[in-house]
Curated annotation (Swiss-Prot):
InterPro entries: KOW (IPR005824), Rib_uL2_dom2 (IPR014722), Ribosomal_uL24_CS (IPR005825), Ribosomal_uL24_euk/arc (IPR005756), Ribosomal_uL24_KOW (IPR041988), Translation_prot_SH3-like_sf (IPR008991). GO terms for biological process: translation. The keyword Cytoplasm does not apply. Part of the 50S ribosomal subunit. HAMAP family: Ribosomal_uL24_A. NCBIfam families: rplX_A_E. Belongs to the universal ribosomal protein uL24 family. One of its GO terms (cellular component) is large ribosomal subunit. One of its GO terms (molecular function) is rRNA binding. It comes from the Archaea. Keywords: Ribonucleoprotein, Ribosomal protein, RNA-binding, rRNA-binding. The keyword Nucleotide-binding does not apply. The gene is rpl24. This is Large ribosomal subunit protein uL24. It comes from Pyrobaculum calidifontis (strain DSM 21063 / JCM 11548 / VA1).
Length: 128
């Protein structure tokens, strides 16, 4: 989904930085595990609080945990197990970009999310 028709990198970056929150949700897409891809029929979904993810890159590579918080403004997620100690000695969650995680368990309690999956599944099968 292009935010701008321009191919210029500066305009691409600007459109990402200036994107409204309702469009930033699309930037939170993360890949699904191969088992979930077969089960649900889609390749990626926006990450939500309650999903279980596996961190694929960075210092916390290999850590699996539930998503505790999603920061739309900064396009980052916070995962149980990915923590650090701040200067006050408190344990805080480390922000992780959603492209660096893989969803291993999806929270399907929301009917709107189930409709999204059905809609995307139809779109993928219709185009082939």
């Amino acid at each position: 989904m292009p935010f701008t028709a321009s191919a210029q990198p500066r305009k691409q970056r600007l459109s990402l930085y200036a994107a409204p929150l309702h469009l930033r949700r699309k930037l939170l897409n993360a890949k699904l595990s191969p088992e979930l891809q077969k089960k649900l029929g889609v390749k990626r979904l926006p990450v939500r609080r309650g999903d279980t993810v596996l961190i694929m890159r960075g210092d916390f590579k290999g850590v699996t945990g539930k998503v505790v918080k999603v920061d739309l403004k900064r396009v980052r997620i916070f995962v149980e197990g990915a923590t650090r100690t701040n200067s006050r000695g408190q344990t805080v969650y480390y922000p992780i970009h959603p492209s660096k995680v893989m969803i291993v368990d999806v929270d399907l309690s929301d009917k709107a999310r189930q409709k999204l999956i059905e809609r995307r599944k139809r779109g993928q099968h219709g185009s082939s």
